[in-house]
From Swiss-Prot:
Any single biological process term in GO: cell-cell signaling
Tissue: Expressed in skin.
Taxonomic classification: Eukaryota, Metazoa, Chordata, Craniata, Vertebrata
Keywords tagged on the record: Cell junction, Cell membrane, Gap junction, Membrane, Transmembrane, Transmembrane helix
Entry keyword annotation includes Zinc: no
Chief subcellular location: membrane
Extracellular side: 41-75, 148-182
Membrane-topology descriptor: Multi-pass membrane protein
Recorded name of the encoding gene: Gjb5
Organism: Rattus norvegicus
Tree of life domain: Eukaryota
Protein name (database record): Gap junction beta-5 protein
Stored Gene3D superfamilies: Gap junction channel protein cysteine-rich domain
Length: 271
């Protein structure tokens, strides 16, 4: 896989991301992809070859390795990074689709705009971006669960005991470079959690921003209303109406006064 081309395509999403999205993209490429390419593959390498058990029984080492390492960390991380970065490419492709439609519209009509700004997060593009955030956060959460299912404590011990057939008895198996591997495991887990938080924060930011844009703005008084003397100087009845505690009874009778309360505290009634 050509990672440089993949990175170049994915970096185009920067133009349509918020500050949280740019931080997420930098975190993914600098702290996850580069660490995976430069160090993780070298640390794991031929992990099965370095898995050693104190027995000469043919097939025992392979069976024990498959029992304790059903899926390699490196393979899981590779699949996780591919799935996590794909939604960002969908956003770029959606923008490219809108620009192509805009260009075709200009060629056919010759004036006007199909989209006010093809790269602006509005309409379907906004939903595509929001769905991409949900998808990325969901993928990271699923892979965190998978790591926990395969390796309950996330970290690797230096020695494991195996008693699976065809091993003659319980044998001790030793994992190569356990401390170094645990450092990278914790690092990748922490960066995944940070990416999840960034996705959720960006999603919350976009929803709040959209709600504030859709909320009706308070209109200022018109010039005609300002020139109206009743608007600047309301009558005494209007002041009394606005400042008093009111009870809407919907009847023609006044409410009875309570004997244990003074008349000054009785609420006024609108007939």
């Amino acid at each position: 896989m050509n990672w440089s081309v993949f990175e170049g395509l994915l970096s185009g999403v920067n133009k349509y991301s918020t500050a949280f999205g740019r931080i997420w993209l930098s975190l993914v490429f600098v702290f996850r992809v580069l660490v995976y390419l430069v160090t993780a593959e070298r640390v794991w390498g031929d992990d099965q070859k370095d898995f050693d058990c104190n027995t000469r029984q043919p097939g025992c080492t392979n069976v024990c390795y498959d029992e304790f390492f059903p899926v390699s960390h490196v393979r899981l991380w590779a699949l996780q990074l591919i799935l996590v970065t794909c939604p960002s490419l969908l956003v770029v492709m959606h923008v490219a689709y809108r620009k192509a439609r805009e260009k075709k519209y200009q060629q056919e009509v010759g004036k006007g705009y199909l989209y006010p700004n093809p790269g602006k997060k509005r309409g379907g593009l906004w939903w595509t971006y929001v769905c991409s955030l949900l998808f990325k956060a969901t993928i990271d959460i699923i892979f965190l669960y998978l790591f926990h299912a395969f390796y309950p404590r996330y970290t690797l011990p230096s020695m494991v005991k195996c008693h699976s057939a065809p091993c003659p008895n319980t044998v001790d198996c030793f994992i190569a470079k356990p401390s170094e591997k645990n450092i990278f495991i914790v690092f990748m887990l922490v960066t995944a959690i940070v990416c999840i938080l960034l996705n959720l924060v960006e999603l919350l930011y976009l929803v709040i921003k959209r709600c504030s844009e859709c909320a009706p703005a308070k209109r200022p008084p018109t010039a005609h209303a300002k020139n109206d003397p009743n608007w600047a100087n309301p009558s005494s009845k209007e002041k009394d109406f606005l400042s008093s505690d009111l009870i809407f009874l919907g009847s023609d009778t006044h409410p009875p006064l309570l004997p244990d309360r003074p008349r000054a505290h009785v609420k006024k009634t609108i007939l």
